[in-house]
Amino acid sequence: NAFFTGLGKGRKIALFDTLINQLEEEELEAVLAHEIGHYKLKHVPKMIIWSFCLTLAGLYLLDLIAKQAGFVEAFGFSSEGYGFGPPFILFILLSSNITFWLTPLSSYWSRKFEYQADKFAATVIGSNLPMVTALRKLNEKNLSNLTPHPLYSGFHYDHPSLIERESALQK
């Protein structure tokens, strides 16, 4: 596996030893170029902004819920004297049910960034072949599903499937 992380002076690219051991040099260069693409295309700050927007939307939703007559009483709380506490506790408890339905939006952005980083790597390397062969090896080693159902993929995959990535690289 490989990933890019960090902001400012704390930026890092991690390449796992298992990745280094299973790929050829040109494939490693493509993977490294892919991770550099995440940096150059500012994917980490964009995802932080996206997460911040989701948090704001969640807090706005909390405000709307907290103002609904009978909401806190429906869960056994008194509406008098507790202020914002019960709605906040309920929001924390119920938020995973809400954010689950937003997962496809986050997955969409993540997959979009993966396509962009793949394209960046192919452009920098001058060929899409090293990236394609690296992806094939990684998918084989990880026993990845080549054709996940789109609905399942939307909720559970933050990276496109091998077939989707290869197809995008061929364009």
What kind of region is each of these model predictions?
Residues 92-104:
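Hydrophobic alpha-helical transmembrane segments of polytopic membrane proteins
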Residues 79-93:
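Hydrophobic alpha-helical transmembrane segments
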Residues 1-82, 101-171:
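Polar-ligand-bearing catalytic/cofactor-coordination segments
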